[in-house]
């Protein structure tokens, strides 16, 4: 029973909510009648064309004899295949976050000098205003880390003398500062909550200017600041793979929409955070981890394909886990035959599972990866291919890295703010109109009713 009066849902509120719902329901046939693209997607799930972008390209089909066919997914950042980018920096034993961020923001791969200068600039910006941790982050810590992150971002507005300046140089400066600060805002917020609500010891580590983004995340998160090279490498790859995914995903489109009003950078990024927080967007890997935790309890032999298949069918029949009828981490709005991010991720995930002595868990994930698409196709009579998506393995990776579940979505935000920044810059550079789609009214015109005549 919640005794917080602020959060109380009274009988009056329940009554009024029912009244509101009854007034707001729209007959689903009307959406078809007026050819409304619900979710801005057509009947096949393809997004309507709402804009153009240089930043990235998500491909899942190929043309054969003039006909579009499903193909293995590919993801391009500024024209470069992400697979080639990851192979490039891992082969040379470099961290990729800063290099790929430079590419997304400036449309070219940096040379050695440009990369060194860019890393130095991000390091320079990796410092919060004096007293910010004490006065903002430590005060009234929230149980939700995405809300904490959004609040911190909005509060930074008051520390910026040029907060409302939307000139490109100023917006770039703001975006680079936020990219640099996101790990601190996220992790310090989590540590403050654990200290005040769970009584845990408080460790506040300053970022190390000589470390990469992924190394700094592990450095400031862990009490002893220790991590292995493989841990840092895999987190770096995870950040790169989550950095950008087209202008039509919900948070990037939110960035375009809010930017088009010419509001400030802090408001735009806070809006994008709010979008990413939603369970339909940024929280899928948490569902995957929780689903597997139950699976490991319910399935006695993790190597038995028949027993695992039986559990997966229970998921689809709404007889297991959250009874939603979903196998989390399988399927994607665009990709069908394969998600390139998951394909890239898998080989590195296996290496970390060996280092962490979690080979049996990895084998279970691999078995589900092989079984789930076939079972979904059979049970749902789907003719479009289905495969695992990047969320399938990312939660397992974060679990192996010892990242608290409360930080899974903020880690996503730490990566995706690079894409948001690139889309904000692109929207401003093209000086487009304010985004304002149409909504068709379907209510009847009514005559005003005097008070004494109302029912």
Residue ranges with predicted function:
Residues 1-455:
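Non-transmembrane, aqueous-exposed alpha-helical and coiled segments at domain scale
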């Amino acid at each position: 029973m919640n005794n917080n009066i602020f959060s109380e849902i009274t009988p009056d509120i329940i009554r009024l909510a029912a009244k509101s719902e009854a007034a707001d329901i729209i007959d689903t046939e009307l959406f078809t009648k007026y050819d409304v693209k619900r979710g801005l997607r057509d009947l096949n799930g393809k997004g309507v064309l709402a804009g153009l972008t240089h930043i990235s390209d998500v491909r899942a089909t190929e043309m054969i004899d003039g006909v579009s066919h499903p193909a293995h997914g590919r993801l391009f950042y500024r024209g470069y295949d992400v697979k080639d980018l990851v192979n490039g920096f891992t082969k040379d034993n470099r961290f990729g976050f800063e290099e790929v961020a430079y590419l997304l923001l400036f449309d070219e791969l940096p040379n050695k000098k440009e990369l060194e200068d860019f890393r130095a600039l991000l390091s320079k910006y990796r410092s919060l205003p004096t007293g910010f941790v004490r006065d903002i982050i430590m005060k009234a810590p929230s149980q939700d880390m995405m809300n904490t992150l959004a609040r911190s971002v909005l509060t930074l507005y008051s520390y910026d003398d040029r907060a409302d300046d939307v000139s490109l140089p100023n917006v770039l400066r703001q975006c680079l500062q936020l990219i640099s600060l996101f790990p601190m805002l996220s992790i310090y917020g989590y540590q403050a909550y654990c200290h005040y609500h769970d009584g845990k010891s408080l460790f506040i580590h300053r970022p190390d200017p000589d470390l990469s983004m992924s190394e700094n995340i592990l450095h400031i998160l862990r009490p002893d600041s220790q991590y292995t090279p493989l841990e840092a490498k895999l987190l770096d790859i995870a950040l790169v793979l989550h950095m950008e995914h087209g202008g039509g995903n919900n948070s990037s489109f939110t960035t375009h929409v809010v930017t088009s009003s010419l509001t400030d950078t802090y408001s735009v990024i806070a809006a994008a955070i709010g979008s990413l927080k939603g369970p339909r967007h940024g929280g899928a890997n948490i569902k995957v981890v929780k689903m597997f935790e139950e699976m490991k309890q319910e399935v006695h032999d993790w190597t038995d394909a028949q027993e695992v298949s039986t559990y997966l069918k229970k998921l689809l029949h709404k007889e297991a886990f959250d009874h939603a009828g979903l196998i989390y981490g399988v399927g994607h709005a665009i990709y069908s035959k394969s998600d390139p991010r998951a394909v890239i991720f898998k080989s590195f995930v296996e290496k970390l599972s060996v280092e962490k002595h979690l080979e049996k868990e990895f084998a279970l994930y691999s078995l589900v990866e092989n079984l789930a698409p076939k079972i979904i196709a059979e049970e749902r009579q789907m003719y479009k291919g289905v495969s695992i998506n990047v969320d399938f393995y990312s939660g397992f990776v974060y679990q192996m890295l010892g990242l608290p579940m409360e930080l899974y979505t903020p880690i996503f935000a730490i990566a995706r703010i690079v894409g948001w920044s690139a889309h904000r810059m692109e929207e401003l550079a093209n000086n487009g109109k304010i985004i304002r789609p149409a909504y068709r009214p379907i209510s009847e015109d009514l005559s005003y009713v005097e008070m004494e005549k109302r029912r």
